[in-house]
Amino acid sequence: MDQTYSPGHMSYELVKADEDFLSTTPSDYSILRRRPETSPYYRTPGPAISRFLRRRYSVEPTSSDYLGNGTIPTTVMYKICSYLNKKDLLHLMSTCKRFRDIGKDSSFWQFLNLYGKHISCSSLHAIIDRKVQVLRLNSATINVEVFPPWHNFPILNPAMLTHLDMSSSKFENPSVLLEILQRCHNLYALSLELCGIIDDQMCKEIAKNTNLYFLNLAMAKSFSAEGIVTILSSCRKLGELNIGWTELSGDVINLTCQLLPPSLKRLSFSGTRDKAEMNDDNIKRICDTCKQLEELDLSDDVVITENCLDHVKNLKNLRILTISRCYGIEPMAFLSLQNLDIFNVYGCVTVEGIDVLRSRLRPTRINVSPLSSIAIPTDGESVTSIWKKRTRDWY
């Protein structure tokens, strides 16, 4: 038989519950609020694969520096750091003061590859302060901070850089490039290919590197007569020079041909196009001054004629000659070049003419290298090395 609840009966039950609640002691509160004991293992959400992790209990913080008490010898830490790449080394340096001081040692920063990176000017100067010797900044973008940092003050510390590749780098302000060059007075190799405008002040800073051997200025702009004279008058130990497609004026071309250092072994003077100053007389000056030349690139110098080949043949050490697209030279004159290892004449003769040259100039190799490698930082299979100096970590 169903039981029927009346309104009076319901009010009686509510009153009874209130009396029970009021009779509850504080100890009962703590018992009721206590959560049931759970297993120290719990299941983590995820796919069908069951994974169980141990619950991590909170630990009281401690101010003890277990690694800073000398438990690990410093010599051991130096050995460990020598196996780390730059990214892991920076992570290690952020853990404690001791590791930060160890990670700043110059032996871990002898080379660095920042290819294609976006980096601030202050960060770059901080990296240079770690006594980097080989630095690759190819295709990097160097920005200026909105709020100028410490480097706005005069930078007095000279850099230890010996090899610097800034090809195709983008600078938010030309003064950034000038600040970098002002710190570099011990360079052995420098590349400013496609870096935009190179003014007279930058040329003066480049000229301070008297031990410069590799200099790549291909496709740079705004060279003045004063700037090029400053560089060539001071850097007399140059072995490889690339000034191809630099849009030099006629006066600058004449001065360059007169002031080239006799120590040159590889020279690229291509891309003058129809400049009348790049003629047979200036080729004669180059051959008379730079008698140790082993490779010469005169591509796209359309004013020179076959008469310049008489002077080129006097270079006893010449092994590679490139005169691609030099349309002013009579192709029959090519047959007089008998002592070359490589002869590049792209665009000068037909395919049948190439076959004739290969048969008549044997064992000279014809049209082997369409692109010049003179003073170029990365050449061949070493895509991350610059001038045969490694810039990449082992992993």
Please place each PLM-identified region on the residue numbering.
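Concave beta-strand-loop units of leucine-rich repeat
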Residues: 114-116, 137-141, 166-170, 192-196, ...
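Leucine-rich repeat
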Residues: 64-68, 74-77, 94-100, 104-108, 118-126, 128-134, 155-163, 182-189, ...
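Flexible interhelical turns and helix-capping residues at alpha-helix boundaries
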Residues: 85-88, 188-191, 347
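C-terminal capping region of solenoid repeat domains
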Residues: 1-54, 63, 76, 251-395
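N-terminal adaptor-interaction module of cullin-RING ubiquitin ligase components
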Residues: 1-155, 161-162, 178, 203
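Long hydrophobic alpha-helices with heptad-repeat/coiled-coil character
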Residues: 155-186, 260, 272-273, 379-383
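Solenoidal tandem-repeat scaffolds enriched in leucines and small polar residues
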Residues: 184, 188-285
